[in-house]
Amino acid sequence: MSIAVQIEGLRRNNIGDVLQAIAVADYLPEAPAVLDREDLPRASGLGKLLLFANGWYMHDYSRFPPPPNLIPIYASVHFSNAAILQKRENIEHFKKHGPIGSRDRKTLFMLRAAGIPSYYSGCFTAALKPRSSGRAIEGMLVVDGVDHKLPDSAVEKIGHRLGMQPRRVSHDPYGNGLPFYQYAEKSFAHAEELLRAYCGSKMVVTTKIHCALPCLAMGVPVVLVHPNPSEERLAPAAEFLKVVDQNKLDKLDRYDAIVLQPEKLRARQKWVADFISAAVECGGNPVANSPKFAPLKAKAARDSRLWFLTLRACHRLGIQKQRLAKIIDAGSFQEKTN
């Protein structure tokens, strides 16, 4: 069976999607096809494909779920909101192809609130393989983007303390005017160039989670900076390293990467490698089909069922309504539980 990965194809404002696809490709026996996540129905004529459907969901829910010739492997997925779960068709699709591996706890809670067996997988970019930079390792690299740019004053301060002249590179993608497959080719090349640049640096300072995680995976010293270190979206990185408060940079004496749980990082990398290998071997979701993942399958079903029943009871009793609203859209939850 042929294999595919997916990337953002509509607005093209997230090189992180490309890096997540590369993280899967690192462990595949052959180069995968690349599909447009926002236009998967276009792949209906390509024959049967095993699709690693990790990444961010999504700009346009009207073209979801994917056509039946695609066998989706849902792990390391992130939902920006609960809109994707407002259609019964989508919920049944996820149940059919579950258990679903979520990239973050918020997505996990949304899936469980919809009664979908699910588990926490973290982000696949934590398992990217090291690249060769082709040159001596030197200097400090500052990686940000237009949506979250480090102030010049902060960059200068970091460089002064480290005695390094910082180099800046953008994490933003390019090629918005190109047809999809040309964009895919150029964006993969651009992402690989970024990975090689990270590996050629003594230290990386970044505001981007999909720069920090690849650096951790490849053994590059990295500092993740954010104005709100406790933000839930940062959790896939925060479980491995300390997130530095952007507003307190001037109070730090060191900018070394702080890996809080290196053993956990190595275990996650092995899990990702085993997961992808098992998916290829069984031609589907290994958590559903491989005996090796049977305990995780049972736990995902049990935990999700318990969560679903608890939330349904709370919703009917009017308990913690505001808190529930932060996890899922109350209207869609009410529709599914009546």
Give the residues covered by each predicted segment:
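Active-site anion-handling motifs in enzyme catalytic cores
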Residues: 1-338
